Amino acid sequence: MVKALLVGSKVLVPSIDESRYLYSNGFYGKPIGISKPKGPKDIVRPLELSLIESVYLTKKGLINVVDKNGDLLEYKKLYEYSAMKINKFEILYKVYEDLREKGFIVRSGVKYGADFAVYTLGPGLEHAPYVVIAVDIDEEITPHELLSFGRVSHSTKKRLVLALVDRKSEGIRYIMFKWVKM
């Protein structure tokens, strides 16, 4: 079991071997100080995991997260902690977990103005073909918001996907947009 340390809103994997293992088995995390690793051989520094990744990996039984006191954070406790730290965590986590379970590689999409950048092969092997924005299905989206979502995805040649999360049924509907010139 990989040992990880909770530090604020990040989780660190100090062991290089364990960092390499996580990265090579799903492209989890980012090595500290290495902006674009090409593969597991480039993982020569500790790995930094997001809270969303950490909750997922804890649920899958792949990592043990401990706090600054050395106390183990079980899945439920880490989930609750993350929900306090991250706005709309429940919705983001549902989408992250669903996409991972479907076999996609899911990374932060902040630099694209989205919640997630989604890969079929992985970072370093391809450019992310999709950007995903997670939305509560009951939340209204204005036409202006929709256009702003699409602006970045269009300029970076990525497909925009809205993930509509229904909290009642726990289902997720995905809508992909294709922008055309007229």
Swiss-Prot record:
An example Gene Ontology CC term for this record: cytoplasm
Active site: Y119, H127, K158
Keyword Lyase: yes
Catalytic reaction annotation: pretRNA = a 3'-half-tRNA molecule with a 5'-OH end + a 5'-half-tRNA molecule with a 2',3'-cyclic phosphate end + an intron with a 2',3'-cyclic phosphate and a 5'-hydroxyl terminus
EC number of the protein: 4.6.1.16
GO MF, any single term: endonuclease activity
UniProt cross-references to Gene3D superfamilies, sorted A to Z: 3.40.1350.10, tRNA intron endonuclease, N-terminal domain
InterPro entries: tRNA_endonuc-like_dom_sf (IPR011856), tRNA_intron_Endo_cat-like_sf (IPR036167), tRNA_intron_Endonuc_cat-like (IPR006677), tRNA_intron_Endonuc_N (IPR006678), tRNA_intron_Endonuc_N_sf (IPR036740), tRNA_splic (IPR006676), tRNA_splic_arch_short (IPR016442)
Keywords noted in UniProt: Lyase, tRNA processing
One of the protein's GO biological processes: tRNA processing
Pfam families, per database record: tRNA_int_endo, tRNA_int_endo_N
Family: Belongs to the tRNA-intron endonuclease family. Archaeal short subfamily.
Function summary: Endonuclease that removes tRNA introns. Cleaves pre-tRNA at the 5'- and 3'-splice sites to release the intron. The products are an intron and two tRNA half-molecules bearing 2',3' cyclic phosphate and 5'-OH termini. Recognizes a pseudosymmetric substrate in which 2 bulged loops of 3 bases are separated by a stem of 4 bp.
NCBIfam families: endA (TIGR00324)
UniProt protein name: tRNA-splicing endonuclease
Organism: Saccharolobus solfataricus (strain ATCC 35092 / DSM 1617 / JCM 11322 / P2) (Sulfolobus solfataricus)
Gene name, Swiss-Prot/TrEMBL: endA
